[in-house]
């Protein structure tokens, strides 16, 4: 025996329509905007009047509007339910006039509160005052765990700087293992709760990295930092591969970029006592190289292969041979093609695969741009040396790098990459101004007035550029000039950085 089918009817509202000396009862849907059926209603009303021998509606259907019986206009963009129209109400069809639309008024507080609650909860929840749910409780618990992890990290690093005991590393590692177990339980039991898995995973990665850095004996130095950074990189990649979320991929890429740069600096410091300024110069040059390589790295991470050249018959025209580079192809002759390979095959990627690859490429580019922008202010801070013999050259290197970062933003079509680069460059400018202000003698003019004027002028220039550039269509000569200025800045940057870092002096001696 089959269960009876359930039929759902839309909410309706029976009202009286008054026009001139005529009155007609009609039933309208109460849950959709009046605009959807208003003109049809006027046409049907006109046809009904003419069928009964009366004069029809004088004006076209779009020249009328609905009023309440007290003369207040109704907004046809809302439904009858939202307007507070109930069964038996009388509405007046009148020519359209200028004025404000009607907002429903309630004679009692309870009726108004009930109507407001119904409107707020029509999409399944209160959109103004969100209640405490299980998701809220879970996120609050993760925040509490993060606070506890922060306390453990601070105490672990403090204790490790005092003593060479393995207890701090064991304590941080033990708590990190517990968080790893929690992440695995969430992964196996609640696979859809990626938020909890990410929370447990990132906290575990931080704790395990600190434990690995504190485990080797000796005073904390570059070697310990290198070990911890490598653990962070491996843990971040693991989380990114497990979650496969777009925003998670961007975060993982940013973390890997920052930690990779810091790990390279730590590796150099392990073997050579390189000065901070030389390391900062190398980092600035490396950041520019990373920005230029961002599209290539993103395509490599997304495994987007070089284009495939084929004919409309399905036979390959070009193919890669054994021993050839991955980005090169060679012509295919008839003797190389087998008969069974001559079938018509569609080798074009499907739209879903192309969209997934595009999202992954975009996420990787966003992460790399954000990571590079986070490192740029620190690198500029390390390059600048106020009141030193080569201070002007350091200022030139930092200024050229910041300018190249700003111009590189126009090479990205998505907004997040460009915004990240521009914000990183602006933060670098503020960091440079702050370093010069802190290094000058304590005084109102040099320590506050001139830095504040410079920062205000830079902000005003940024505002002017933001207002003019997006709304202006520049001529090709202007765009070509900007490109040539960018090339000249790159040409001037490399010798200046080499001279500032002592490369020419090292080669001469």
UniProtKB/Swiss-Prot annotation:
Subcellular localization, per the record? Cell membrane
Membrane-spanning residues where? 135-155, 170-190, 196-216, 222-242, 248-268, 281-301, 364-384, 389-409, 418-438, 449-469, 487-507
* GO CC terms, sorted: plasma membrane
Q: Which InterPro entries match?
A: EccD_transm, T7SS_EccD, YukD-like
- Keyword match Transit peptide: no
Q: Which key words are in the record?
A: Cell membrane, Membrane, Transmembrane, Transmembrane helix
Where is the major localization of this protein?
membrane
Lineage, top-rank taxon, reads: Bacteria
| UniProt membrane topology term | Multi-pass membrane protein
Q: Does the keyword Transmembrane helix apply?
A: yes
Q: How does it assemble?
A: Part of the ESX-2 / type VII secretion system (T7SS), which is composed of cytosolic and membrane components.
Q: What's this protein's family per the entry?
A: Belongs to the EccD/Snm4 family.
This protein is called ESX-2 secretion system protein eccD2
Source species, please?
Mycobacterium tuberculosis (strain CDC 1551 / Oshkosh)
Lineage, please? Bacteria, Bacillati, Actinomycetota, Actinomycetes, Mycobacteriales
Gene name tied to this protein: eccD2
């Amino acid at each position: 025996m089959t269960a009876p089918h359930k039929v759902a009817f839309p909410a309706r509202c029976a009202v009286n329509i008054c026009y001139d000396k005529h009155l007609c009862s009609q039933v309208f849907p109460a849950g959709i905007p009046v605009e959807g059926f208003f003109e049809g209603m006027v046409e049907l009303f006109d046809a009904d009047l003419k069928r009964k021998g009366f004069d029809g509606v004088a004006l076209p259907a779009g020249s009328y509007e609905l009023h309440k019986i007290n003369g207040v206009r109704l907004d046809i963009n809302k439904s009858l339910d939202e307007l507070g129209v109930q069964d038996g109400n009388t509405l007046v069809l009148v020519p359209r006039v200028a004025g404000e639309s009607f907002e429903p008024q309630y004679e009692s507080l309870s009726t108004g509160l009930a109507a407001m609650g119904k409107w707020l909860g029509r999409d399944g929840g209160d959109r103004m005052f969100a209640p405490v749910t299980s998701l809220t409780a879970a996120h609050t618990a993760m925040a509490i765990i993060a606070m506890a992890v922060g306390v453990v990290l601070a105490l672990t690093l403090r204790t490790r700087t005092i003593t060479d005991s393995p207890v701090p590393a064991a304590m941080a590692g033990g708590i990190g293992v517990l968080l790893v177990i929690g992440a695995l339980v969430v992964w196996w039991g609640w696979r859809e709760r990626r938020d909890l898995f990410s929370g447990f995973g990132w906290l575990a990665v931080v704790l395990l990295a600190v434990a690995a850095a504190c485990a080797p004996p000796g005073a904390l130095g570059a070697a310990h930092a290198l070990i911890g950074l490598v653990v962070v990189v491996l843990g971040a990649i693991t989380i990114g591969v497990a979650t496969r979320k777009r925003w998670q991929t961007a975060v993982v890429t940013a973390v890997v970029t920052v930690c990779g740069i810091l790990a390279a600096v730590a590796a150099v410091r392990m073997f050579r006592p390189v000065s901070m300024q030389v390391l900062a110069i190398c980092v600035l040059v490396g950041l520019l190289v990373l920005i230029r390589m961002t599209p290539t790295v993103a395509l490599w991470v997304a495994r987007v292969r070089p284009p495939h050249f084929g004919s409309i018959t399905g036979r390959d025209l070009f193919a890669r041979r054994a021993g050839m580079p991955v980005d090169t192809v060679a012509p295919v002759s008839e003797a190389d093609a087998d008969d069974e390979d001559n079938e018509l095959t569609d080798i074009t990627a499907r739209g879903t695969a192309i969209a997934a690859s595009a999202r992954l490429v975009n996420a990787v580019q966003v992460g790399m741009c954000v990571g590079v922008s986070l490192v740029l202010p620190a690198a500029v801070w390390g390059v600048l040396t106020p009141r030193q013999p080569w201070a002007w050259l350091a200022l030139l290197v930092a200024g050229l790098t910041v300018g190249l970062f700003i111009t590189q933003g126009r090479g990205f079509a998505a907004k997040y990459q460009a915004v990240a680069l521009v914000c990183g460059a602006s933060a670098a400018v503020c960091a440079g101004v702050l370093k010069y202000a802190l290094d000058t003698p304590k005084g109102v003019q040099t320590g506050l007035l001139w830095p504040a004027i410079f920062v205000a002028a830079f902000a005003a220039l940024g505002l002017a550029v933001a207002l003019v550039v997006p709304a202006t269509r520049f001529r090709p000569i202007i765009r070509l000039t900007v490109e040539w200025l960018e090339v000249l800045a790159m040409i001037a940057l490399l010798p200046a950085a080499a001279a500032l870092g002592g490369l020419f002096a090292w080669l001469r001696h």
